[in-house]
């Protein structure tokens, strides 16, 4: 394989909802380019993409697959991304290292929630988009309705390059209004026959051609002037206008294929090779210092590793994009993130499960290598005198969590090691050892995401594991003022222990003025503040600690011990053992002994006084509330609304968008526990959602009592 230069390379992400046919399209592209001699199928589990055992087990893409095709002296690096929203991280990774996206649309359903999710990410990253309508041979395909829905969502920027003469099982012809030709196929697909557009299709073709010419002309003043003068553009001028429209996202070309029968795939690759922008024509990336980085093969050597993982029969494979300069086998590079040195082994052009050894890859190209000693996903490796770092991939918050444990506790360490390594392969799921909840928690994008994780642990790592519900991080607070005092006294020969603390607790809200007096037992006491600490608690909220002891009742040297005792009880609220927050404590009196008083005595006295006062101050449990956005087909809106109301959700607003609804709500975290499973069941997997922490709010009284009883039962069981 020859070395391709930067101006001969195009990087493309293949996106689409689950079932839209991306892996089948990828197989046809690889077959059409001659890399493989026979097309595999998803059903036969022998495709170049989707080659991991877990993907064979479930019949869905789990990881993004990198491959390339050589077409008309161009190199197209293509990343086939998982379609399930549970694996959205693959699409996000791919979009950040490619320059444009082909978004497949299932001709049976039109734009789905997954389509719109993918499109939003292309919008955020300002990537060109080509829409590809697939499954045109399905008897459920309604092409005109699909186009109408696309126009309703994406507007006039959707410009048809092609349309099918008919759809359904007899599909065998596409009219191309850029070339003004018709492509036809025999029943087995493959190489097309290119013919003139028949008379009965000419009016429609001319109308769409005129729309295409107008859209292309709008992207270039010279083309616009020619269009006004002649009302026509040459084929090359059309390509130039479309290319500029792709870069500015003013045109979203629409193509047609039947990937399963290899119809229309070669024409798509021709367009990708001839029209879509090169790496060198796209906006420049920036390093972590904000410096603009040009994809220049003569620039400093810098390589970004966007994906690492263990692959069958090979070991660790690391995928990279050359950001600048050239990379060759044997290069000595420095890891800018870890400070370690790396010698690059054999480098490869990617072809899914296959790899093709190459001598060199230049700026803008994508490749892989194996068995690096200290490279993780997201690391940057540089040559001499280069200190760049890249950190541009941002992943969404997890939406589904479970506690995880090894069935055999002796394998706990092995489990943690495997989890941390697998997080490097897929950064969209997180592992946390929660001191607060006393659980090891894995958080992912959905139930299917974690189910595939479990399968890999059991089958690849030979670990027996089990999932349990994740505990909820409740908080405790108070609703009224209360006072208490406690004397700690212990005498056992020699120096004893003595400390007495009198204190007041009350709810604290941001901006509250400091107290000047309090009524205690009907008598008003003035507060003389000797010291004040405002502590931002690491679990959220505040503790305000005021020392107003006068007359030397307690030495100032014991105040840190008193605060420590209070903080100890703040970490273990009396209702459920949860963290306490938003409390003001005023220590106003106490007693000490000239010999027996010490820090331990006052810490214990303060802890018990605070606990007693807290219980009398109208203690309440707070629960985490999340902002929820649900994207759902309009047909399912009633069921989704009803389900949310049963989950104590507060509906905040709704928007409609071409057959879909975007619903905003606030919902307790407890009610989100199995929401991804329920939503998928209600909508046949055609809805998606995002969440974000919003606030802590009081739980209803009936739930509070239930939580207190559950905590008491757990505490008794542990004893």
Describe the role of every protein-language-model region:
Residues 1-719:
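Structural and coupling elements of P-loop NTPases
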């Amino acid at each position: 394989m020859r070395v391709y230069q930067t101006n001969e390379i195009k990087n493309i992400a293949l996106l689409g909802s689950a079932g839209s046919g991306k892996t089948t399209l990828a197989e046809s592209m690889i077959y059409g380019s001659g890399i493989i001699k026979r097309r595999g199928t998803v059903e036969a589990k022998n495709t170049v993409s989707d080659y991991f055992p877990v993907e064979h087990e479930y019949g869905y893409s789990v990881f993004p697959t990198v491959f390339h095709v050589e077409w008309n002296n161009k190199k197209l690096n293509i990343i086939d991304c998982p379609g399930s929203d549970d694996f959205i991280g693959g699409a996000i990774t791919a979009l950040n290292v490619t320059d444009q996206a082909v978004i497949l649309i299932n001709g049976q359903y039109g734009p789905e929630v997954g389509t719109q999710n993918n499109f939003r990410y292309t919008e955020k990253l300002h990537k060109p988009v080509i829409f590809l309508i697939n499954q045109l041979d399905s008897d459920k395909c309604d092409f005109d309705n699909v186009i109408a829905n696309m126009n309703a969502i994406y507007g006039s920027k959707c410009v048809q390059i092609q349309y099918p003469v008919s759809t359904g099982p007899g599909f065998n012809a596409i009219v191309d209004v850029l070339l003004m030709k018709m492509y036809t196929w025999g029943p087995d697909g493959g190489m097309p026959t290119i013919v003139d557009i028949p008379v009965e299709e000419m009016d429609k073709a001319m109308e769409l051609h005129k729309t295409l010419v107008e859209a292309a002309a709008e992207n270039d003043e010279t083309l616009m002037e020619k269009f006004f003068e002649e009302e026509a553009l040459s084929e090359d001028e059309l390509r130039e206008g479309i290319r500029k429209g792709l870069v500015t996202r003013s045109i979203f070309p629409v193509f047609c294929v039947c990937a399963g029968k290899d119809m229309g795939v070669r024409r798509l690759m021709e367009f990708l090779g001839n029209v879509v922008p090169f790496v060198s024509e796209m906006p420049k990336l920036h390093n972590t210092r904000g410096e603009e980085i040009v994809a220049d093969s003569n620039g400093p050597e810098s390589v970004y590793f966007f994906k690492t993982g263990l692959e069958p029969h090979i070991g660790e494979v690391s995928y990279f994009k050359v950001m600048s300069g050239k990379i060759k086998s044997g290069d000595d590079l420095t890891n800018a993130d870890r400070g370690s040195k790396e010698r690059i082994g054999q480098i490869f052009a990617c072809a899914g499960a296959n790899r093709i050894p190459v001598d060199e890859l230049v700026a803008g190209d994508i490749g892989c290598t194996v068995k690096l000693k200290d490279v993780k996903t997201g690391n940057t490796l540089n040559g001499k005198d280069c200190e760049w770092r890249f950190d541009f991939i941002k992943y969404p918050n997890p939406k589904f969590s479970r506690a995880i444990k090894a069935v055999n506790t002796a394998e706990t360490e092995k489990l943690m090691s495997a989890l941390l390594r697998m997080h490097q392969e897929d950064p969209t799921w997180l592992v946390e050892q929660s001191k607060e909840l006393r659980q090891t928690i894995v958080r992912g994008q959905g139930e299917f995401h974690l189910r595939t994780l479990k399968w890999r642990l059991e089958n690849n790592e030979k670990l027996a594991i089990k999932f349990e519900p994740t505990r909820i991080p409740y908080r405790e607070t108070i609703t009224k003022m209360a006072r208490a005092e406690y004397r700690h006294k212990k005498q056992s020969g020699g120096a004893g222990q003595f400390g007495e603390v009198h204190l007041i607790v009350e709810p604290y809200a941001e901006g509250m003025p400091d107290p000047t007096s309090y009524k205690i037992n009907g008598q008003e006491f003035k507060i003389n503040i000797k010291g004040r600490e405002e502590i931002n608690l690491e679990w959220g909220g505040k503790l305000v600690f005021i020392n107003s002891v006068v007359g030397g009742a307690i030495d100032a040297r014991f105040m840190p011990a008193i605060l420590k005792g209070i903080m100890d009880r703040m970490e273990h609220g009396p209702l459920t053992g949860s963290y306490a927050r938003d409390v003001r404590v005023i220590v106003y009196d106490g007693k000490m002994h000239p010999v027996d008083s010490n820090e331990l005595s006052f810490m214990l006295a303060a802890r018990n006084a605070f606990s007693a006062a807290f219980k009398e101050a109208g203690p309440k449990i707070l629960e985490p509330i999340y902002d929820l956005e649900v994207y759902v087909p309009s047909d399912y809106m009633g069921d989704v609304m009803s389900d949310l109301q049963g989950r104590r959700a507060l509906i905040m607003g709704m928007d409609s968008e071409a057959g879909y609804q975007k619903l905003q709500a606030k919902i307790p975290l407890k009610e989100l526990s199995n929401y991804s499973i329920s939503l998928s069941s209600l909508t046949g997997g055609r809805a998606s959602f995002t969440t974000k922490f919003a606030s802590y709010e009081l739980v209803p009284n009936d739930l509070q009592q239930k939580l207190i009883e559950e905590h008491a039962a757990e505490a008794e069981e542990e004893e």
